[in-house]
From Swiss-Prot:
Organism of provenance: Pseudomonas syringae pv. syringae (strain B728a)
Note: Carbon 2 of the heme B porphyrin ring is defined according to the Fischer nomenclature.
Keyword set, alphabetical order: Cell inner membrane, Cell membrane, Heme biosynthesis, Membrane, Transferase, Transmembrane, Transmembrane helix
GO terms assigned for molecular function: protoheme IX farnesyltransferase activity
Protein name as it appears in the record: Protoheme IX farnesyltransferase
GO biological process annotation, one example: heme O biosynthetic process
Gene Ontology CC terms: plasma membrane
UniProt catalytic activity: heme b + (2E,6E)-farnesyl diphosphate + H2O = Fe(II)-heme o + diphosphate
Transmembrane parts of this sequence: 9-29, 36-56, 80-100, 108-128, 135-155, 163-183, 209-229, 230-250, 265-285
Pathway as given in its UniProt record: Porphyrin-containing compound metabolism; heme O biosynthesis; heme O from protoheme: step 1/1
Localisation per UniProt entry: Cell inner membrane
Sequence similarity: Belongs to the UbiA prenyltransferase family. Protoheme IX farnesyltransferase subfamily.
Major localization listed first in the record, in broad terms: membrane
Superkingdom of source: Bacteria
Amino acid sequence: MSLKHFIQITKPGIIFGNVLSVAGGFFLASKGNIDFGVFLAAVIGTSLVVASGCVFNNCIDRDIDQRMERTRNRVLVQGLVSLKLALLYATLLGIAGVGLLYTEANPLAALFAVIGFVIYVGLYSLYLKRRSVHGTLVGSLSGAMPPVIGYCAVSNSFDFAALTLLVMFSLWQMPHSYAIAIFRFNDYRAAKIPVLPVKRGILVTKRHIMLYILAFLVATLMLTVGGYAGLNYLAVAAGMGMYWLYMAWKGYKAVDDTVWARKLFVFSIFTITALSVMMSVDFQVTKELLVTYAF
């Protein structure tokens, strides 16, 4: 048991991705008027809550992880950290994160952190992941909470922009997760996890991917239509969304579904990273509907 093991069970890669989305939501709401104290509270607080959820997930999924090639060497599977200590660690991380958001940001930001945690640990990890093909859909809501937390840490309100972020990031999660399920198909089948490709086939999953990317593309444009983000953001969102859709369409002719799914997965990360950056820098200081640009 070492410090490295305690870091590993928090899934640092997932935390880093969530930090980017928290920052995107925060800077979108800040409109250039940045309170760095609140920013740090939002980033650190959300990171702690996400870390807590990941540790709990590691605890819950020990039996599943033993059956999957990519996870069978995880810290808890190997017994490098005891279950009791991991549960205590996860609890302390969660309390610290929610407490920081509540005291240094606002109660609304803390509330969304709690909602995301409950969905991820309670609904998804403990129940739906093992029992329902719809587990991915429910789990996507938890993955969409970080940008909402960042936004609400500034705005202290759940407005159209916050709703758009929630919908947008939830929709993004679906093709992203389905791509993983395709190129890790054998792992999911061995672990008896009822993801869409395993339960209904890869062709059906490809259709769902196309529909979710199309819906995601429309949702991303709403930040500019609603007067929250600018035309540069719009151009990047439209361009990357359409290319992601094109990549998904190419999946129907793919010779190797594993190779295609990996490429789709990688581009999904580029897409959401680019949009998080663009909403951070191309915000609208005064809210103007897109129709304003036409006159």
